[in-house]
Amino acid sequence: MRILQNKTMKEQDNQLKIPEPLRADWFMVLVTIQADLIYNALVVLSSPFFLLYRSYRRAVVTVSAAEKAVKRAPAQIAGGAGRVVRRTWFGILGACHVSMVMVLALILAVVIGVGIVSLYVEKPVVVRDRLFFDYTEENPSAVFSFDKKKRSFSVPVGHSVHVSLVLWMPESEINRRIGVFQLKVELLSLKGETIARSSQPCMLRFRSKPIRLARTFVMSVPLIAGIANEAQTMRIDALKHQEKMPRTKAVRATLIPRAQTRTLPQLYEAEIVINSKPPWIKRMAYNWKWTLCVWTSMYLYVAILTALLWCFRPVLFPYTSSRTISESENLEIEVVEEEQEQVMERRRRERRNQPRRRNFATTQKSYT
């Protein structure tokens, strides 16, 4: 029963429902629909012409780009040639600069290396000088001083000193009768103290009377001509000493007659010979002095070049740094220009490709 009542009530409501009135803007809607139809018809009719115009514009842009590329090619070629010449010139200047720096570094290394080796290596002392014995003394003596020369010198500490005397003695009757005499050699310090002493007997070589006569007969012509003489040369290894503190400043040689006699030998000339021998390490360094100079200079040269490369690279390669900076700036400018051209081209394309057709919904919204 309730269901039937509901149905009857709904039917009565439908019968009593008031119809909706007509819209007030129905005229504007009709006008809008007609305008859209006209616009779409015009777009469809004019689209071939727009397509032709766009293709024409694209052809014009392509031709202009080709013309720009053709015009830019000689400038790029000229710029490339100038760049090649500039780089060649910078390369020559850089090579000259690097060569000059390397030569200066080599000279500096050689000077320092030779100086270091000269400071370490000790040259053996070799001295040969005349001695003059003072026969006014009871025992004639002669002194050789290391400060006598124009340039004073001394024996380095650690060297072995060998002192020798060379006596040129005539074969006179007095020297033959004397026979043996004593030779004393002393090393004196700066204060006059005796550092080392050596004394040994000396005598002429014995020659019998027949030998002397035969020799005189055979050598008569050279003796008369003055080419030969009747004399003997005696070399005496007098003293050997290890140099240490206090330092040696002079060498004194003294002639002492035989015991119970006062006759002294006759001398034509006397010489002193001093030779020093360094320790074996410094002796080896002295023998290989130039090799040490070469190797020390090479090591220093490598060290100087390494220091220049690590700490003073602009001094060694000044043109490279300036060239890299200029090239980087030019590259940045070119990149910026290319980006600007790409942005402008992209904007042009976006403007050309903007849609010129509006849909029906947007038009209806604009009118409403």
From Swiss-Prot:
The gene is SEI1. Knockdown mutants have a reduced accumulation of oil per seed and a reduced overall seed size. It is found in: Endoplasmic reticulum membrane. It comes from Arabidopsis thaliana (Mouse-ear cress). GO terms for cellular component: endoplasmic reticulum; endoplasmic reticulum membrane. The N-terminal domain (1-98) determines the lipid droplet size. It is a multi-pass membrane protein. This is Seipin-1. Expressed in seeds and young seedlings. Not detected in leaves. GO terms for biological process: lipid droplet formation; lipid droplet organization; lipid metabolic process; pollen germination; regulation of double fertilization forming a zygote and endosperm; seed development; seed dormancy process; seed oilbody biogenesis.
